[in-house]
Amino acid sequence: MSELLSLDFMRQALIAAVLVGIAAPLVGVFLVQRRLSLIGDGMGHVALAGVAVGVLTGKAPVLTALVAAVAAAIAIEVIRGRGRTSGDIALAVMFYGGIAAGVVIIAKSPSSSPANLTAYLFGAITTADQRDLWVFAGLALVVLVGTWLLRPWLFAVANDEEYARASGLPVTGLNIALAVLTAVTVVVSMRVVGLLLISALMIIPNATAQLLGRSFRASTRWAVLVGVVSSVGGVIVSYYAETPSGGTIVLLAIGFFVVAATGTAALARARAHQHRRAERHDHEHGPECGHPAVAHGDHVDYVHDGHRHAPHEGHYDEHDPARHAADGHGTGSHDTGSHDAAKETAPR
């Protein structure tokens, strides 16, 4: 690990991974709530056209990609909000138009080569220099500040757009703001995970967080944690395993999702087993049943198979004897109804 940290390009790569690991899930949490999980892919393919323009003109590809992605974000929201075309169709047009334009433009570049786009398509975080890092840091700061300041209103729109509109919120403006933040996040992340995989870092940490968090705030924290750990861990693993950083980061994020899904499912099954309804008994409890009788308030419990059983009109409530001993009467688990309701129906 000390060897890794002694390398300038790896330190820069780790810093960029942290920035992307925070920014992408923060924007993604609102996209998941609004069921726009694939909008990052559309933005990424439009950004590809911007990268191609930068390569062709000799300008910084990051800046031209940013202009293209932001313009596409605004266009999609305008078409969706005012035009007759639905949002998914508008996104599809931008999706295919962007990638087609990128391929055609890059073919016209004097230095046309697949390597020109590989770093942007699949990520090449270790090739980012200090200037790139400053640009990424500035764009990531825009995303962090924007999501922090707009989070109450973005949450309101994501939760119920029609109610937010009726409440007087500028829904169209907030939609455009979210689309622009998404475009900026795509550009920030394209050198880390690549334009073809950027949606994964926006969506998968949030999918994992929804399994672990019980509230929107908790889910957001979990998403950022999973995003940062996946990004940093993916960079470290890719260095030692000599694998592409983008694919490694995404596979690690998917691994966290699988572990969380498996663990929460197993925990849910264990809890369901603990609260299994009591089976009916083949015999009736009463003075002649032969089991020890224990006075319990205004009725009598009978000890059977390590539990107390209280006869209540055709069913039996099972009580944990350890809890009875601890608190004097306990609350037990019932086949139907609460213990208080069972007491009301007990034979007197």
Residue ranges and their predicted role:
Residues V192, L196-T243, G247:
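Transmembrane alpha-helical segments in multi-pass inner-membrane proteins
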